[in-house]
Amino acid sequence: MAIISTADDLLDSDVYIDLDHTLGIPLNLKCEGFNFAGSVKLRAATSMVASGLRNGLIDEGSTLVESSSGNLGVALSIVAAARSIPFVCVTDPKCNPATVKLMRALGSEVVVVDRPDASGSYLSARKALVRELCEHNTGYVWLNQYENPANWLAHYENTAPLIAKQFPALDVLFVGVGTGGTLSGCAEYFRENRPGVRIVAVDTVGSVNFGLAAGPRHLPGLGASEPMPFVHRGLVHDVVQVPERDAVRMCRRLARHGFLLGGSTGTVVSGAARWLAEHDPGRSLNAVAISADLGDRYIETVYDDAWVQDTYGDLHTEREDSNG
């Protein structure tokens, strides 16, 4: 039994989904969404705020401000509310409507930028507004998830050791890439402690991570429109890029087995399934993937037929149904 005092005390989950049983994919999926934030981002949010309080960056009278496409904004809303710290989230139109409502319900102020850059991304506009807010408002503190070492340290100190403990014979770990915090923290831990474990980064088509070509993206979470400081090719053994259409197909396929998971999770599972089919036809590898989020916030996007049709066209989901 767990008795907690604050919402961010509920952090660690030992829940793994055996996808071989449901989808025929030899993969264990670590569920990071079973906390009050509903995503892995609660780890980074808790770590960054704790670090800021320790080093004096955050003090009485501070207001936190951060750029987020959604999940980190919710996580920081929870951490800030638990500590009675005001929080302003700068997001964009791609943020799921349910996520915006959730942040506001938690007491956060949400500001939505509306001018994308040439690639259709809002990241540069979000960051510019954060800088402007900090410049013109005394006490505003930007935690800067993109460069704050407490982001990746959360996974170096917690996420990766938990996986290593549960899977002493682990061969390969699949990690989605956004800011690179989860990836770099896990990669550094296993490089130092279990160098035989292969780290496979899973990114979305259209992301510039690892020097790949920029393109349009519709799902918040994974991917980046500009290079992320934590992400470099030397961290990983391989990189898989997944089209968003495939990620949506996988989300819907999982949902038909009762697992309503987020777009980031659909991307990672789709990429892991493709990599394992190519590199482990004998199904001998002990594989784990990190599920970053749950699917309730994607009801109006990934799981909405009209949105999917308008965004991607016909996904031929009936073909996916026949495979699982």
Task: State where each predicted segment sits.
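PLP-dependent amino-acid enzyme catalytic core
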Residues: 1-324
